[in-house]
Structures are given as structure tokens and as C-alpha cells.
Regions:
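Acidic donor-binding segment of Leloir-type glycosyltransferases
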Residues: 1-12
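Glycine-rich, basic loop-to-helix element that forms the pyrophosphate-binding segment
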Residues: 12-30, 51
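Short, flexible, basic/aromatic active-site loop/helix in glycosyltransferases
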Residues: 67, 81-99
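Acidic donor-binding loop at a coil-to-helix junction in glycosyltransferase catalytic cores
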Residues: 124-130
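Catalytic core of nucleotide-sugar-dependent glycosyltransferases
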Residues: 139, 151, 159-184
């Protein structure tokens, strides 16, 4: 019943090729100039799209995100915040080491995404690869200094970011950035060394690192 009232088009893929290539097809299917990312189990603030479209048009931005508030079970009980830089120069510098965007808050211009090569098979880092490619293609970026989404976090998120396989894929993605000249060798080596510690530590330690060291309490 709800499905019939909402003009959502589905484009099922015949074969699971991973998130990056699925997002690539999604971009190609979009019919409008501005595309919004959203995760199914997250909650956008009611005026998220209005605020983002207005700022994108006012400042002629190609890529715009914002901050997130994280919860475990109850969206009204926020446990942490992930705040990101808001100005283009800060974003460009920050993106070389960590993601300068919360992907579930992002809006971007379709033509700039295509100019940057669209999403690729990202080895768990399809968003970071696209952000760097868009910056290299001349995209003007920004982040709203506001909470745009409430995001569910839990043990599953921390488990996915650990283990030898994750570390291997992370290193391969960073190598791709290095070969493209988007990061320096020192940035590559430093990020892989840090990720090695995080990926190989016990799950509860990884959760502590993410929630207490890489997040804000307010």
C-alpha cells in the first residue's frame, strides 16, 4: 500500500556485483540534475533536502553533505556525533586521510559525478574514491554545519571494519588513490598503518576507538 503511494522506481540487478557498481547503475538511472544519497535504516531530518538544495543553488556546489547523530536502538537517544569540515579547502585537505563526508547525507550533481567517472568497484571505499575523483575533476564541495541524519550504529558496523580481508581491501583502495596522485606516499603509509591497528584489534577495542576517539559527544 505504501509502495503504491510513493513514486519509487526499482532497478534490480541480475547479479550482485558489490555496492560500488550498484551505485554506479543507480546514478545512471537517475533522471534529475541533483541526486541524494540515503541509507534505508537512517532517518533524515524533515527539511534536509530543502536546506541542501537551497545551499547548492546559492553557492553553486557540486557536492554537499552534513553532520550525523548516531543512535543504537532509539533515535531519540543519541550516543555520538560525526562532524565533518564545512569549507571546501578544509574538505580537500581532510579527504586525503579520512572521509570528509557522511555518505548518507550527501547530495551531488549528476553531471559532475559522471565527469569524475561515476562510482567504481570501491573495495568498501567507493564513496571516498568518488569524492577524491570529483575534487580532482574540479567539483566545488561543502558540508552544512547541521545534523542532517540520525544514523543507526551497532556491533555489525564495527565488525565490518575489522579483519585481514578488510585491511587488504582498504590498502588496495588507498593504492589506487596513490597511483592517481590524489594522496602522497606519506599519507598512504600513515593511513594504512593506522588502519592496520584498528582492523586487527579486538572488536570491543575497535568500537571504543570509533565511538570515543573518532566521534564527538555533542
Amino acid at each position: 500500500e505504501a509502495e503504491s503511494d510513493i513514486p519509487v522506481k526499482r532497478y534490480p540487478l541480475e547479479q550482485n556485483q558489490g555496492l560500488g557498481l550498484a551505485l554506479r547503475q543507480g546514478v545512471l538511472q537517475c533522471q534529475y540534475d541533483i541526486i541524494a544519497r540515503m541509507d534505508t535504516d537512517d532517518i533524515a531530518v524533515p527539511d534536509r533536502f530543502e536546506k541542501q538544495v537551497q545551499l547548492m543553488e546559492k553557492n553553486k556546489l557540486d557536492l554537499l553533505g552534513g553532520h550525523i547523530a548516531e543512535f543504537i536502538d532509539n533515535p531519540d537517544e543519541i550516543v555520538s556525533y560525526r562532524r565533518v569540515p564545512t569549507q571546501h579547502a578544509e574538505i580537500v585537505a581532510y579527504q586525503r586521510m579520512r572521509s570528509a563526508f557522511n555518505h548518507m547525507t550527501v547530495m551531488f550533481k549528476k553531471d559532475m559525478v559522471l565527469k569524475a567517472g561515476n562510482y567504481e568497484d570501491g573495495l568498501y571505499m567507493e564513496d571516498d574514491l568518488l569524492w577524491l575523483n570529483m575534487i580532482a575533476a574540479g567539483a566545488k564541495t561543502g558540508n552544512l554545519d547541521q545534523i542532517l541524519c540520525k544514523v543507526r550504529v551497532g556491533a555489525g558496523m564495527f565488525e565490518r571494519r575489522g579483519g585481514l580481508r578488510y585491511l587488504k581491501l582498504y590498502r588496495q583502495a588507498r593504492q589506487r588513490m596513490l597511483k592517481r596522485g590524489q594522496i602522497s606516499y606519506m599519507e598512504y603509509a600513515k593511513s594504512v598503518a593506522i588502519q592496520m591497528v584498528v582492523a586487527l584489534c579486538p572488536g570491543f577495542v575497535r568500537q571504543f576507538i570509533f565511538m570515543k576517539l573518532l566521534r564527538k559527544s555533542k
